[in-house]
A protein has these predicted regions:
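Cysteine-dependent hydrolase recognition
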Residues: 1-274
C-alpha cells in the first residue's frame, strides 16, 4: 500500500521543507487534531499549508477541520500563508455562496486588514486519491528547489509545473485533476519562504532626457528592477553580477516622474520615484 495522508505530509516536511528555509513544522492529524489547533497555528504565523485528506465545498474534513466561518475568525494579519489542498471540492465556487477557498482570500480582521491566505489551490470537483498527491509532491519539490532543472518563484508557476509532473506521471487521471484544480489568488504572486530581508541598491535619482541606459547596483543576482508610469511598464531588467541595466528607449523621451520597484526573492521591495 501507499502512504497515509499523515505519512505523506510528514514526507513533504522531511524530504523538502525541512532542508530549505523553513525551520518548524506542525502536523495536525486525526484523531487528536482540532479546529482550535489549526487556527492557533495559523494565527501564530505559518508560511505554507499542505492539506491532504477529505474536504468539501465549505471546509476541510480531517486533522484541523476548519470551515468557512473558522477562516473568517482568523487573526493572522500580516502573516498570510499560501495553501495547497488535496481534497474534494473546496474550490466549488460555482455552486456555493462562498466556497472554502474563496473564504481564505476574502477574510479580514476587525479593521478590514487581510487575514486568511495570499493564495489557495483547491479543486472544484471531487478529487481522486493518488494523482493529486503526485502534484502536491512536485509543488513542494519545486518550491524548495529540489526538482531538478525546475525553479519557480511564483505561486502559479509552482502549481502549473507541479500539475505538469502529475500529468506526466498519471496520464488522463492527472489531466482531469489539472482541469479542475483552481488557483484562488494571483498566480503571478512571487511567494516568500522566509522572513523577508532588507537589501541596498545604488542608483541615480534622476533620468536625463535622451539617456539610453539606467544602471542599478544591487549586489545580488536575479534582482528585478522595473520602471513604470501611470501603471504602464516602461522597462525592466534582472541583475547579472549584481548589476541591472535597463534600456531607457521608452522612458527618457520626455521629462516627468517614473516609478521604480526593485524586488528579489525573500526580500523587502525597494520603491522609489525618479525624476
Amino acid at each position: 500500500g501507499g502512504l497515509s495522508d499523515d505519512e505523506f505530509n510528514d514526507l513533504l516536511w522531511n524530504d523538502f521543507l525541512s532542508g530549505y528555509t523553513y525551520d518548524s513544522f506542525q502536523g495536525i492529524y486525526d484523531p487528536n487534531g482540532s479546529v482550535s489547533q489549526g487556527m492557533d497555528a495559523i494565527n501564530a504565523g505559518v508560511g505554507v499549508i499542505n492539506y491532504t485528506g477529505h474536504a468539501g465545498p465549505t471546509g476541510w474534513g480531517n486533522g484541523a477541520p476548519l470551515g468557512v466561518n473558522d477562516v473568517h475568525q482568523l487573526t493572522n494579519t500580516d502573516k498570510l500563508p499560501f495553501v495547497f489542498t488535496v481534497g474534494c471540492n473546496p474550490g466549488e465556487f460555482n455552486n456555493y455562496g462562498e466556497s472554502f477557498c474563496e473564504a481564505w482570500l476574502r477574510a479580514t480582521d476587525d479593521e478590514g486588514n487581510p487575514t486568511g491566505a495570499v493564495g489557495h489551490l483547491g479543486s472544484t470537483i471531487s478529487q481522486s486519491w493518488e494523482p493529486p498527491m503526485h502534484g502536491q509532491w512536485a509543488m513542494n519539490s519545486i518550491l524548495t528547489e529540489s526538482y531538478e532543472e525546475n525553479i519557480s518563484r511564483s505561486y502559479g508557476g509552482i502549481i502549473v509545473n507541479g500539475c505538469m509532473h502529475m500529468n506526466e506521471s498519471q496520464g488522463a487521471a492527472g489531466k482531469n485533476e489539472t482541469n479542475h484544480w483552481t488557483i484562488f489568488g494571483d498566480p503571478s504572486l512571487l511567494i516568500r519562504t522566509d522572513e523577508p530581508e532588507e537589501f541596498n541598491a545604488i542608483y541615480d535619482q534622476t533620468i536625463l532626457v535622451g539617456q539610453e541606459e539606467f544602471i542599478v547596483d544591487v549586489g545580488l543576482d536575479g534582482v528585478l528592477v522595473a520602471l513604470s508610469s501611470n501603471g504602464e511598464l516602461l522597462s525592466s531588467s534582472y541583475s547579472v553580477g549584481g548589476i541591472a541595466i535597463l534600456d531607457l528607449g521608452n522612458v527618457s523621451t520626455s521629462p516627468g516622474e517614473v516609478d521604480m520597484v526593485i524586488s528579489a526573492f525573500n526580500t523587502i521591495p525597494i520603491e522609489d520615484v525618479l525624476t
